[in-house]
């Protein structure tokens, strides 16, 4: 029975029904794609509002990647420092003579450096414990710039809000910015398929072996 | 079912000299602490315990003074074939979750606990009993400080998954990372060895790349004394054993009388 063959008095019911279905569908999408993620992720602001742009101007290095590596360094055994400890900050920051008059620097000097306490940063890109990711293979051997995967994070003046999945405890940057699975940038999502996608694209299918990234 | 399979670049393998092995069990302990192997309140429950490196004792069954004893340390054999000529180990062909594969770079049989669904089919397929099932979540006695000794390089397994020896694959990654920091892509022979190899006080275990003729393992496997466990199953393990005792070699794989190649006595070989 097509819509046209329905008697006039019943057609109204049908149109109403279809409208309700469309409204309900859109409503469900709004709940699922916008309201649910808001409930799923808890938001945290970083302990210090770190300004990457200012630091980038003041560190040595010819290329952008070399400048990043000044603080986010590699150790001798090839391990990656990640977010540096306050020892690294102390190379430049001296409590006697602050480098600027910013409140954030004062906070660092009084709250953390004076008490010799590590800053409890939230890690945007911390992978689950079953994942192994060697930065050295990507940065040194494959010569991939930091910017390729982390975007403008290194030149930003403000740190983004850290969003943590309330169920799994992982960062939203790992889990995916868009719940629909849509991905615009490398830094939107860093899951297994994203590793494999890039390996395949670059012609390194041998690195799609399970043990390359799992431990 | 035949998988597309390329020959691995490296074929890491192990040679265990049973003439040198004293059965002290250091390899078992070293392995367990290296790989965050969980313990049970009752470790004597041998049906449920986990030991990636298992130590077996065999005797020739004769009465004193002719009794002889031999200890056989048994890691995962990292087989190359399933016994029917297919280029994957018995455990890999049965895995329904693709949780275990032959690593294309190293030839090591990988086991991904987070991928495993715990059906235990691989455990049934493995002729060497090298796979263990986690009946409980990983347990480390509280207040003993054991959890502080956990290695961050190996993930702790949850209940309901199978685990096994990985030839300390994280050590391979560690060696590779260091080589890359020095600008090299190839590893030196001594850079990547397993925890059991390093720990063995008798120096009975040798580890290296079987594809590289310069490595000591590829020379040792050509010895008269070399054999593999259950060789007649044709799973082509990458773990070799050395023994000059005929009864040991016979017990390792019930040979028919004409099958066993005799080993020349030590005095004649020199």
Outline where the language-model segments fall:
Chain B
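Non-ligating segments of multi-cofactor redox enzymes
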Residues: 1-270
């Amino acid at each position: 029975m097509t819509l046209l063959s329905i008697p006039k008095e019943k057609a109204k019911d049908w149109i109403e029904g279809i409208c309700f279905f469309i409204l309900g569908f859109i409503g469900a999408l709004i709940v699922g794609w916008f309201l649910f993620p808001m409930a799923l992720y808890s938001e945290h602001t970083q302990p210090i509002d770190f300004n990457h742009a200012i630091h980038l101007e003041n560190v040595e290095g010819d290329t952008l990647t070399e400048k990043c590596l000044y603080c986010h360094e590699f150790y001798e055994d090839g391990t990656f420092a990640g977010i540096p400890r306050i020892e690294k900050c102390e190379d430049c920051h001296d409590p006697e003579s602050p480098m600027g008059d910013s409140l954030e620097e004062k906070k660092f000097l009084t709250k953390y450096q004076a008490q010799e306490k590590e800053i409890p940063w939230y890690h945007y890109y911390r992978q689950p414990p079953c994942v192994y990711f060697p930065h050295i293979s990507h940065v040194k051997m494959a010569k991939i710039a930091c910017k390729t995967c982390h975007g403008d994070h290194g030149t930003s003046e403000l740190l983004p809000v850290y969003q943590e999945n309330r169920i799994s405890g992982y960062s939203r940057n790992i889990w995916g910015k868009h719940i629909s699975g849509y991905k615009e940038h490398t830094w939107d999502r860093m899951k297994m398929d994203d590793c494999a996608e890039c390996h395949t694209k670059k012609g390194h299918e041998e690195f799609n072996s399970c043990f390359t990234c799992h431990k | 079912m035949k998988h597309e399979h390329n020959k691995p670049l490296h074929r890491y393998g192990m040679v265990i000299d049973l003439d040198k092995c004293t059965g002290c069990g250091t390899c078992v302990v070293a392995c367990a602490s290296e790989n965050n192997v969980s313990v049970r309140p009752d470790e004597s429950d041998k049906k449920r315990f986990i030991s990636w490196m298992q130590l077996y004792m065999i005797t020739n069954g004769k009465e004193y003074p002719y009794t002889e004893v031999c200890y056989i340390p048994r890691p995962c054999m990292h087989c190359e074939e399933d016994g029917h000529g297919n280029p994957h180990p018995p455990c890999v062909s049965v895995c329904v979750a693709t949780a275990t594969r032959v690593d294309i770079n190293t030839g090591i049989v990988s086991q991904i606990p987070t991928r495993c669904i715990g059906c235990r089919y691989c455990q049934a397929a493995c002729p060497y009993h090298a796979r263990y099932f986690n009946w409980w979540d990983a347990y480390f006695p509280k207040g003993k400080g054991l959890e502080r000794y956990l290695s961050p390089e190996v993930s702790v397994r949850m209940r309901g998954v199978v685990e096994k020896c990985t030839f300390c694959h994280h050590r391979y990654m560690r060696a590779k990372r260091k080589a890359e920091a020095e600008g090299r892509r190839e590893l030196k022979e001594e850079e990547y060895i397993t925890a059991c190899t390093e720990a063995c006080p008798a120096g009975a275990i040798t580890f290296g790349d079987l594809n590289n003729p310069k490595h000591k393992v590829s020379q040792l496997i050509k010895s008269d004394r070399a054999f593999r466990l259950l060789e007649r199953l044709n799973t082509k393990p990458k773990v070799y054993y050395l023994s000059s005792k005929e009864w040991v070699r016979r017990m390792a794989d019930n040979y028919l009388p004409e099958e066993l190649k005799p080993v020349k006595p030590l005095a004649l070989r020199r």
